[in-house]
A protein has these predicted regions:
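Residues immediately within or flanking Cys/His clusters that coordinate Zn2+
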Residues: 62, 142, 162
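RNA substrate-recognition surfaces in RNA-acting enzymes
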Residues: 81-90, 96
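Short Cys/His-rich Zn2+-coordinating modules
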Residues: 103, 122-133, 147-150
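Short, flexible, mixed-charge glycine/proline-rich loop motifs
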Residues: 132-141, 155-158
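Short cysteine-rich clusters marking metal-coordination/redox-active sites
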Residues: 145-148, 165-168
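Short functional micro-motifs and their immediate structural scaffolds
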Residues: 152-153, 170
Length: 172
């Protein structure tokens, strides 16, 4: 039995033979999977250097890297200490590397923890994920940052609710 629940109606499901996977990613213009062996740092840095988009919006663009959604972009940027409204092309090599590495770390941890159960998400066995227990900024507006004690803020950026620490993630 296969059960698929998508309350917000964002998802689709397709069944592919393993040998068709690469062609599928290319046809859908999906970026690489955020795994060490697939997510090339130099390609990532070059893409950031060419874009004036805010880094949050750029990370949500699935052509850059596949799989990052709103929750995990907030968490990646908090860990990397980058303001979500920063222009992608202004990031230093060190900052771009931090985002790259934290993308791999956050999504790896999310998979390990079974995802984030915020409202209705459960796995195929009906079990809640536990990654939400490890969120540092997402859905933490008006709470203290665990790193510095500053109050977490929530703003709208690119039409998305965006959580960040104004002290740890300074805009400049």
């Amino acid at each position: 039995t296969l059960v698929y629940e998508d309350v917000r109606k964002f998802g689709t499901m397709e069944l592919l033979a393993p040998d068709l996977l690469e062609a599928y990613f290319i046809s859908k213009k999906l970026g690489p999977e955020p795994r060490e062996q697939d997510f090339d740092l130099q390609v990532f840095k070059n893409a950031l250097a060419k874009s004036k988009k805010p880094i949050k919006s750029h990370l949500l663009d699935q052509t850059l890297v596949a799989g990052l959604g709103n929750i995990y972009v907030d968490e990646v940027l908090w860990r990397a200490q980058i303001h979500p409204a920063r222009s992608s092309q202004t990031l230093t090599a060190v900052e771009a590397t931090a985002i790259h590495d934290q993308t791999i770390a956050v999504l790896g941890q999310a998979v390990e923890k079974g995802g984030s159960t915020i409202r209705t998400y459960t796995n195929a066995f009906g079990e809640d994920g536990t990654m939400q227990d490890f969120h540092q900024v997402y859905d933490k507006a008006d709470q203290e940052c665990v790193r510095c004690g500053t109050i977490i803020e929530k703003i709208q950026l690119g039409g998305r609710g965006t959580h960040f620490c104004p002290n740890c993630q300074r805009r400049s």
